[in-house]
Amino acid sequence: MPAPQMAAYPAVRLEPQARTAQDRSRIYSHRFRDAKPINFGRASPRKLAVHGVDVSRWQGDIDWPKLRTQGANFAYIKATDGGDHLDPMFRKNWREAKEAGIKRGAYHFFYWCRVASEQADWFIRNVPKDPDALPPVIDVEWNGDSACRRRPSPQQVREKMQVFMDRLERHYGKRPVIYTAPDFYEDNLKGAFNDYPFWLRAVAQHPSKVYPGRPWLFWQYSGSGLSQGVSNKIDLNVFHGSEAEWHRWLDRVGS
């Protein structure tokens, strides 16, 4: 929604709390650039209203207020890997993103050689139970750089995911979002978890082409975004809906 018009009342000074509350609902338009732009044609993510980012330690020290004005209306922040690794920038990013008025959530990179319940406990230990946060995310993909070379069967994958997601949903009271990439989805997730929201990576084609028949909540459309407020490249994402639908979804999930 548009920012409140204050020019007509130059003598009035809003209290910081009121100004912050008003500003938090504002949607900033997309001003990101892309080092490797893709022409999505009529299915361009730019036609959608609510854009955001996902970040980790690789983005370094982020100027969150500046990033927000570039169009980061939401951010998913890397929190944990496996059962014993915490992203060193998580706590700082978690705090400063909220201070900047950005709707933010945390994500966990799942390790296939670790027990699912241990990973859930590690995430819960490190990610605050903030009622304003977006639903937590489980990031499931194949990692060629991992020391864990054994790939579980599709059934084992889904069983591990279910244990992890059930534990998080009980703790945070919000159904987790599943983030995935095309190869992992094809191997393990086609037709599964139809009652969970999906966040889909599709950087060359629209998700409807890469994941036919799969409804999606978020689309990661670029891994080469450029923005003021961040020195390195950044992942760009968009919410599947209008600005009004975004606010309704936030109300529904309690964020």
Each PLM stretch: what is its role?
Residues 2-52, 193-255:
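Functionally critical loop-and-helix segments that line ligand-binding/catalytic clefts
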Residues 37, 45-65, 78-162, 169-171:
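Substrate-binding cleft of extracellular glycoside hydrolase catalytic domains
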Residues 71, 79, 98-101, 127-131, ...:
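Sec/Tat-exported extracytoplasmic proteins
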Residues 73, 134, 216:
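Conserved acidic residues
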Residues 75, 105, 176-177:
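A local structural micro-motif
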Residues 84, 113, 185, 207, ...:
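Flexible, glycine-rich phosphate/dinucleotide-binding loops
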Residues 135-212:
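Catalytic domains of cell-wall/extracellular-matrix polysaccharide-remodeling enzymes
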